[in-house]
Amino acid sequence: MYQIVGKRGSGKTTKCFERARKQGAIVLCTNKRAMRVTADELGYQDIEIVELADMKDTARDQKVVVDEALYVFKNWLEKAFSVKVDAISFTEN
């Protein structure tokens, strides 16, 4: 799995759009309206953008690029299981 890592404002979202275009992938995010505006401003009108609720209609073999994966995961856990995520851990490259 390819990883895009960087600080806030370092171009991670742009790299997600680039990766999605190159791989023929969709972009999964927490707010598709805001992401659509960003994509359009950056010239990525061809990229499909979805939220978790849209994933049930996505083809099983569809490639997905996840923007801000920790927030997407947190939102999924909190909505699906009515929990409040307090902390997470992850392994750095």
Where are these regions (language model features)?
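Hydrophobic residues in beta-strands of the RecA-like P-loop NTPase core, especially within AAA+ ATPase
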Residues: 65-67
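Short beta->alpha connector loops
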Residues: 8-10, 69-72
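Conserved P-loop
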Residues: 1-58
